[in-house]
């Protein structure tokens, strides 16, 4: 490879990445997922478009694994362990039982549609059986979904790859050796995949955390150390025949949920690296496919994709979530719809090609086609389906910017900046009248281009910028004070006519509003009553019906319900009482 060739590769790579980023700006306008646009750029530049011939499957496999490791590390860093209280076991059920059911149903349909034997059909089912972390993390961000739904989908996508990889490798071995039966040793292999991945991931994450917090380095080196450590955990786990994908996700989870030096620098760097990984991975996968090869299989492949989307995935979700009573029917329906397929099925489809199996090119083309249909149909309709099934909640008020304050090694102090809108009650109030959360301080106030020295007598005006020092757990309380309210009164319409304290006793509430207790302890707090009615760990947005009245969880205080919204039937709304 001479200098001219190397320079040409740099030029082509830079042009493709730049084109992907620039064209992705059309995503929100067209309502098409960014990943589809990046995939399309790769296809247009490929053999049937720009003429770039790329058929190096081992390189695609390498790029895909590297990119997924970075994406899962970033996803783990941003996943809060608190979300496990509502979604860990349901997500693991979907990641195991759900993948098995999807694989079986999709495999039987594939065998019938493409005249394959049952093992070959099941291999297709295994290849497309798991949801994709890159697609899920990318498309769910900022959609305002309730915590139970978001956490279930994210944890599922981060933990279901071991099952899909295990099934794919097992079925490839069976086809290569001519086996037709299953053995108990396969179950042992699966347990080993999960076990080694879990132990190495958690242990590696803890060691990385200690290393980052104890070693003094230049600030810019900490993100690189975390990325290198994550890839090391990924590689070691794979070498031990465990699940590297699960391990690197858990590694990020451990680091992201403990005080860590240069936290914001690490997150910002990983955000950019995760985007670069997604762009590079989907560009390579787009270049790898030959679009005209998809046309002969388009109709049966579309039928298989719709079968998986409309039947196999919904049935697997219904069975997988059957033991978990806290999930409403509409939440199950949404989780069933958002079975997003992305890079993982395409990467798994490279396995049969590298093994030299018959029909390997068919497996690859089918996987690519199903991913394309999934992203176009499910990804594009995600916001609309979320509203239709009512799984969205009003967004938490957030500062317009936030920055870390590295006061000490594991400092969690942050600087939050709020812009005061005209609708906030604090406009016209003096600073001394504000009920600031404990442990927070107003550090500065900007009015126009001028920096003011805030004092207790300073009166707040529309457009003021307030700089507040605090911790992440102070954000909900600070948001109520300073953030711009949701448009069109979304929070009032969503939570009901009044919002009651969770500590309010049922006896007082029922007496005030004329409700019937019917054997319920009048001293029971409203929060405990709603938790019992939900049937599991509650989240903001959970709704229950009692006394012909809708009760909605409005605020969570840790694991406990803090406030409850109440909506009365039309025409029977009583006067205000305990509401805030």
UniProtKB/Swiss-Prot annotation:
It catalyses: K(+)(in) + H(+)(out) = K(+)(out) + H(+)(in). The chain crosses the membrane at residues 6-26, 34-54, 57-77, 86-106, 108-128, 162-182, 193-213, 217-237, 240-260, 269-289, 292-312, 334-354, 366-386. Residues 402-484 form the RCK C-terminal domain. One of its GO terms (cellular component) is plasma membrane. It is found in: Cell inner membrane. Keywords: Antiport, Cell inner membrane, Cell membrane, Ion transport, Membrane, Potassium, Potassium transport, Transmembrane, Transmembrane helix, Transport. It is a multi-pass membrane protein. It comes from the Bacteria. Belongs to the monovalent cation:proton antiporter 1 (CPA1) transporter (TC 2.A.36) family. NhaP2 subfamily. This is K(+)/H(+) antiporter NhaP2.
């Amino acid at each position: 490879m001479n200098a001219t060739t190397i320079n040409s590769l740099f030029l082509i790579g830079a042009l493709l990445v730049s084109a992907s980023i620039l064209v992705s700006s059309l995503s929100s306008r067209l309502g098409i997922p960014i990943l589809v646009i990046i995939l399309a750029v790769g296809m247009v530049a490929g053999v049937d478009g720009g003429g770039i011939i790329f058929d190096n499957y081992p390189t695609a496999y390498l790029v895909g694994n590297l990119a997924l490791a970075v994406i899962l590390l970033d996803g783990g860093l941003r996943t809060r362990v608190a979300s496990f209280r509502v979604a860990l076991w349901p997500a693991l059920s979907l990641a195991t039982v759900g993948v098995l059911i999807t694989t079986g149903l999709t495999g039987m349909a594939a065998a019938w549609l493409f005249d394959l034997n049952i093992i070959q059909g099941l291999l297709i089912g295994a290849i497309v059986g798991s949801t994709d972390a890159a697609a899920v993390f990318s498309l769910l961000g900022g959609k305002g979904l309730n915590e139970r739904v978001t956490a279930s989908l994210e944890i599922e996508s981060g933990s279901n790859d071991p099952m899909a990889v295990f099934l794919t490798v097992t079925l490839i071995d069976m086809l290569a050796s001519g086996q037709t039966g299953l053995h108990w040793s396969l179950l042992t292999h699966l347990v080993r995949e999960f076990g080694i991945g879990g132990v190495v991931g958690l242990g590696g994450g803890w060691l990385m955390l200690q290393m980052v917090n104890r070693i003094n380095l230049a600030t810019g080196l900490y993100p690189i150390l975390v990325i290198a450590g994550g890839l090391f955990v990924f590689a070691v786990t794979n070498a031990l025949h465990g699940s590297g994908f699960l391990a690197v996700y858990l590694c990020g989870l451990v680091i992201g949920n403990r005080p860590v030096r240069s936290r914001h620098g690490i997150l910002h760097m990983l955000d950019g690296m995760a985007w670069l990984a997604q762009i590079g991975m989907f560009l390579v996968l787009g270049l790898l496919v030959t679009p005209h090869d998809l046309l002969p299989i388009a109709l049966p492949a579309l039928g298989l994709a719709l079968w998986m989307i409309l039947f196999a995935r919904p049935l697997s979700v219904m069975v997988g979530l059957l033991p978990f009573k806290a999930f409403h029917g509409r939440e199950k329906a949404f989780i069933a719809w958002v079975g997003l397929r992305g890079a993982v099925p395409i990467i798994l489809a490279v396995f049969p090609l590298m093994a030299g199996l018959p029909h390997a090119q068919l497996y690859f083309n089918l996987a690519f086609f199903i991913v394309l249909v999934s992203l176009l149909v499910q990804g594009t309709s995600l916001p609309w389906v979320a509203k239709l099934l009512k799984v969205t909640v009003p967004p938490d008020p957030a500062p317009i910017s936030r920055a870390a304050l590295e006061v000490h090694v594991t400092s969690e102090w942050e600087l939050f900046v709020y812009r005061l809108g005209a609708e906030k009650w604090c406009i016209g109030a003096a600073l001394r009248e504000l009920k600031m959360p404990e442990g927070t301080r107003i550090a500065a106030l900007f009015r126009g281009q001028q920096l003011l020295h805030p004092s207790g007598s300073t009166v707040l005006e529309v457009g003021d910028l307030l700089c507040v020092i605090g911790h992440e757990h102070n954000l909900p309380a600070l948001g109520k004070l300073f953030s711009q309210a949701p448009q069109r009164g979304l929070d009032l319409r969503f939570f009901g006519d009044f919002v009651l304290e969770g500590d309010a006793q049922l006896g007082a509430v029922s007496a005030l509003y004329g409700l019937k207790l019917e054997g319920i302890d009048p001293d029971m707090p409203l929060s405990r009553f709603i938790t019992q009615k939900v049937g599991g760990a509650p989240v903001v947005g959970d709704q229950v019906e009692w006394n012909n009245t809708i009760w909605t969880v409005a605020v969570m205080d840790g694991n406990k319900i803090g406030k409850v919204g109440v909506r009365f039937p039309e025409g029977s709304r009583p006067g205000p009482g305990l509401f805030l």
